[in-house]
Amino acid sequence: MALERELLVATQAVRKASLLTKRIQSEVISHKDSTTITKNDNSPVTTGDYAAQTIIINAIKSNFPDDKVVGEESSSGLSDAFVSGILNEIKANDEVYNKNYKKDDFLFTNDQFPLKSLEDVRQIIDFGNYEGGRKGRFWCLDPIDGTKGFLRGEQFAVCLALIVDGVVQLGCIGCPNLVLSSYGAQDLKGHESFGYIFRAVRGLGAFYSPSSDAESWTKIHVRHLKDTKDMITLEGVEKGHSSHDEQTAIKNKLNISKSLHLDSQAKYCLLALGLADVYLRLPIKLSYQEKIWDHAAGNVIVHEAGGIHTDAMEDVPLDFGNGRTLATKGVIASSGPRELHDLVVSTSCDVIQSRNA
């Protein structure tokens, strides 16, 4: 199978990071003063973000030492005490993982990348500083997508993608808090521990499994509707990320009455499962550039589930070869078919353009 080793590494790395983030979520919330930092853009970042990024990048480097990584976080400005907290959480997670969830013949560390010291942690985090680009292959990582949801005790996701020559070829998303019965579906046995993992390789379909197992994979597909009035939208919780007022205007124009609001790329997973039909993320300002790690893993999962993923104004595919950001404006993903997706995008474009009319 194409990218077989890469898929194994991505799945097990996301799985282990999902376990850690689920385990420490309540602790991070209870001790925000010591576990959470505010970045320069006023967004929060937690011990969990850094620990998850460290686990995943170390797994990548241990198996593909020459591969580059575009990661969201940097170790710049972190105190030794904070980095020590990251390492301690990783060690505590190792004990739980090795006892209950370890898979044979998989290495998260090796002699070159032992992950034992504070300097090891800093080095691994900063391997995520690659700028991306049009040529070659690199991994794209958001260790906790939806940090504000994580800090509310709600939905978040661990997201990893492999991009080759500007095209996402593999995506893996861990959703540690996802309970499908909350969205009208039946849950799979074993989801209670730490949710689900969704994954896809381009050309090979999209699948999901309880994270506790990650061996029994069920193929998934979007649902196709004939009328926008029957659609359910997927939207974020935070108003700082997308224009909720304009998204409401789009829904009114298309006679869409049902919406689900949740953080993170878990929205892409619900779309791929056929539990909703269109993901709206309209830019608050046209100058805003989406980060590739917020959409890369979801891109290939939606595509392989039969969906469509474009910008919100010109109806063009998202370009993941532009560096660390997308050049296009806004994001819309839908279950299709093409004519309905085009209608949603054209309506979105009209609404966005009317703000300056």
Swiss-Prot record:
List the transmembrane segments.
none
Q: How is its activity regulated?
A: Phosphatase activity is very sensitive to lithium and moderately sensitive to sodium. The inhibitory effects of lithium and sodium are overcome by high concentrations of potassium. Lithium exerts its inhibitory action by blocking the products of the PAP hydrolysis at the active site.
The family database entries (Gene3D superfamilies) matched by this protein are listed as: 3.40.190.80, Fructose-1,6-Bisphosphatase, subunit A, domain 1
Can you tell me which residues form the catalytic site? Answer: D49 (proton acceptor), T147 (proton acceptor)
Residues annotated as binding Mg(2+) 2 are: D142, D145, D294
Q: Which GO terms describe its cellular component?
A: cytoplasm; nucleus
Q: What is this protein called?
A: 3'(2'),5'-bisphosphate nucleotidase
